[in-house]
Amino acid sequence: MTLLALKEDRPTPKAVYNWRVYTCAAIASFASCMIGYDSSFIGTTLALPSFTKEFDFASYTPGALALLQSNIVSVYQAGAFFGSLFAFATSYFLGRRRSLIAFSVVFIIGAAIMLAADGQRRGVDPIIAGRVLAGIGVGGASNMVPIYISELAPPAVRGRLVGIYELGWQIGGLVGFWINYGVNTTMAPTRSQWLIPFAVQLIPAGLLFLGSFWIPESPRWLFANGRREEAIKVLCWIRNLEPTDRYIVEEISYIDADLQRYAREVGKGFWKPFLSLKQPKVRWRFFLGGMLFLWQNGSGINAINYYSPTVFRSIGITGTNTGFLTTGIFGVVKMVLTIIWLLWLVDLVGRRRILFVGATGGSLCMWFIGAYIKIAGPGTTKTEEAKLTSGGIAAIFFFYLWTAFYTPSWNGTPWVINSEMFDQNTRSLGQASAAANNWFWNFIISRFTPQMFIKMEYGVYFFFASLMLLSVVFIYFFIPETKSIPLEAMDRLFAIKSVHNANKILMDELNFDRNPEREQSSLDEKDRVTQTENAV
């Protein structure tokens, strides 16, 4: 099997895997670049000497400073929580593409407001207000982009294409982690030093805004809203095939059948998906989607993203530049491993297996780091020149090993699964629920991490390690493998009782249904058996 080999649900023309579908996914993923950047730059910006001096952090007690920092960080997640819910309404009435335009505008306004902050008159209030609006923008985009990409993607590369969204997140995060190292080493600690990281937010948001005028609307949304001719035209353009091609005819028939079935079972309309929550199978999938983000945030990733200087200081890394450098390396490792996940792991190894490995290995690393901090107490050292012990070096190694386990597993896979497992009539609501869950748990972590490090110290790492172990049990019993399964067959996948064998069972069913020669051979065999029995 080659690196980029694909497992197809049916014979697929090579033209389907064309530049158009990848370009649309890449443009939509500018949204994740702005999410990744905003998630990573804020922690190190709050540690910049110019920022701490401008807003007089030295005058705060440790508890008061932790509260201020957590408020600056967490209002973004609070806004994102509500933005992800607003996206359900905009998705229904405006569609996927125009929703992306709207949320990029909201983000741009929020980012511009942040630039008005200063230490003399306005204080940090513009930053807090702007981060609420920016949060609404990224919350809506985090809902919309995985849906949009999954509805454009051929099944064999759906994980890879939704993974571009995760790659964009890591690229934005990489820039966010390194930008403060750059301004801290090359610029004097003036107001301009900390304004630059805030201003850079406007770049990915502007690219998303402009790019959204070029990408087409989701053909599935167009079909669902009665714009059939436009939907077929868009589908043919994305697939690079003629309307009469067998692949296009089959895909249209699958979409039609799915829409007709749900029109009967659920009905059409803005409120109808809410009525579908009466069905246990729908509620169950909403629960699964939300729990995936609980376990993702329970790994500790966002404690590191938002408060990396605090995290590295607890291990024993002191000095502003040293902390920024270590954080930047963390961003590089994450991006490289995301590319590996995107090109190989997610669609070849599958979703379940990498979640198992990531949670198990990551948990072991967290146990080691916590034990080291408990025994050595490196975070108690106050001097900037403190040297790392061999145990401290080992702890840093295990931190990066944790990154190697977490990134190609839990970082993007929950988004992929949530983009796949809901049917057409509940997909927007389901993704809104999943994104809201992500931002809710994100808010909890970002709001309380500074206080957790003050109160729990090494226990923070034991806490995250325990949650990662619990996620292994959850995945084994409740999450089926979704790779290569058409969106229209997800109901059948989640109806199969044998969770660990569900993917194989369904793929065998799909291959049998689409192989008339095999079916005819089976019928001929039955006829021969019947004739033999009659002869006897």
Curated annotation (Swiss-Prot):
Residues 48-74, 120-131, 182-195, 307-327, 374-389, 457-458 are extracellular. Residues 516-536 are annotated as: Disordered. Keywords: Glycoprotein, Membrane, Quinate metabolism, Transmembrane, Transmembrane helix, Transport. Residues 516-530 have a biased composition (Basic and acidic residues). Glycans are attached at N184. One of its GO terms (cellular component) is membrane. It comes from the Eukaryota. GO terms for molecular function: carbohydrate:proton symporter activity. Belongs to the major facilitator superfamily. Sugar transporter (TC 2.A.1.1) family. This is Quinate permease. It comes from Neurospora africana. The lineage of its organism: Eukaryota, Fungi, Dikarya, Ascomycota, Pezizomycotina.
